[in-house]
Amino acid sequence: MKKLTALFNLPELKNDIELHNMVLDSRKVKAGDLFVAIKGHQVDGNQFIDSALHSGASAVVSETELSSEHLTVAFIRNVPVVKYYQLARHLSSLADVFYDSPSKNLTLVGVTGTNGKTTISQLLAQWAELLGHRAAVMGTIGNGLLGQIVEAKNTTGSAVEIQSSLSTFKHAGADFTSIEVSSHGLAQHRVEALHFKAAIFTNLTRDHLDYHQSMENYAAAKKRLFTELDTQIKVINADDEIGYQWLTELPDAIAVSMNADFKVGSHQWMKAINIHYHFKGADITFESSWGNGVLHSPLIGAFNVSNLLLVMTTLLSFGYPLENLLATAKSLKGVCGRMEMIQYPNKPIVIVDYAHTPDALEKALIAAREHCQGELWCIFGCGGDRDRGKRPLMAQVAEQFAEKIIVTKDNPRTEPQSQIEADIVAGFKNMEKVGIIPDRAQAIQFAIESAVENDVILIAGKGHEHYQIIGSEVVHFSDQEIALDFLK
């Protein structure tokens, strides 16, 4: 419980009020809660104050656009309503106070970048547990203690959800948490008051331009984690163009590279000298500030080499011995829907991956090629009501790296599938190796029944998701389940 005066020291509040939780959704308010009414992109929480009061809210903090109204108090049915100027921007700080600064009592690692956030955050949590910690994770797949993850709505939750979840993890015994930090979460100040032991930058490629409008805005949002927030250790992928630039601006950042010729300029660094890819993963010979060695990766694909090096570097920067990390690495496991391989005897190999940007699709196809002795198939679509500009770029990537391509549904949402397909098809030079099968299950069935034993089929775009959004309806759908049905 938290007293209202601990948040707002106001003389009008003569009788202090004990509060149970901070709640943003009026439908979830219970007796004793503080209802937070912020002006979001689609909904203004101030419209739901009456509903929250009916549900038993003990107090309300309400966003105002007038600085003159800041911390003024009105009473509705004897319930205090505190006006707060720029509430959304300061909500992380208020929630930090309300939940007793949980990130100060955890080792918190933030992971940002276009691709790799989920894999890295999951690997961090796995490795931390192998080193004796109780770890939790927050991100695209879900939130919770490792092994008890509950599905999440967004990659980065609301400022209140984040602080509340960290508090829950702490009280459940967690001492280590990795969190995916999206560009939306940074731009909307949802992680503002968190105390990061470290932050990792993976890469920056085209995504979310429907929201950010330009790559410059997108990069600026990501950069805030390293320049404006409370971040102690900065670990950056030097092979990314933006990452390399940031390393020149952040002298204390740690550089990580897969390039043996990388010229070290940072005071701490990690680089791969030789990488041997094989059917079960990769053997990575590396040099670093902490010593040299060979890391045996159980994950497939070159981009997972980068992911693993970023994770190991972060843990080395925390002081874990190199030999302990190398000994425990073999126990790491792949992440659901991230280059997830499904194999049956005498059948084509199926790989399910979340790749839904041109760069991620290219990397997934290159990784799949490592395991392909026959033809490489690519099944993909693009989400509706989202960045249309990346659709022809996805087509160009598929045409360059795959022998057979099937364009299908992803999550069309409210946009006509025919429009999405037209945008994708505009990117192909010719349609000789391209088929269009809108029904995703039929597309997967056709590929599996047409491909032969040495072929590889990459099913891209949905990964861990077990649903499709068609119109406003969410229907059950799993790439893995469909693939298994037709492989058996």
Swiss-Prot record:
Coiled coil: none annotated. Pfam families: Mur_ligase, Mur_ligase_C, Mur_ligase_M. GO terms for biological process: cell division; cell wall organization; peptidoglycan biosynthetic process; regulation of cell shape. One of its GO terms (molecular function) is ATP binding. It is found in: Cytoplasm. Its EC number is 6.3.2.13. Its cofactor is Mg(2+). This is UDP-N-acetylmuramoyl-L-alanyl-D-glutamate--2,6-diaminopimelate ligase. It comes from Haemophilus influenzae (strain 86-028NP).
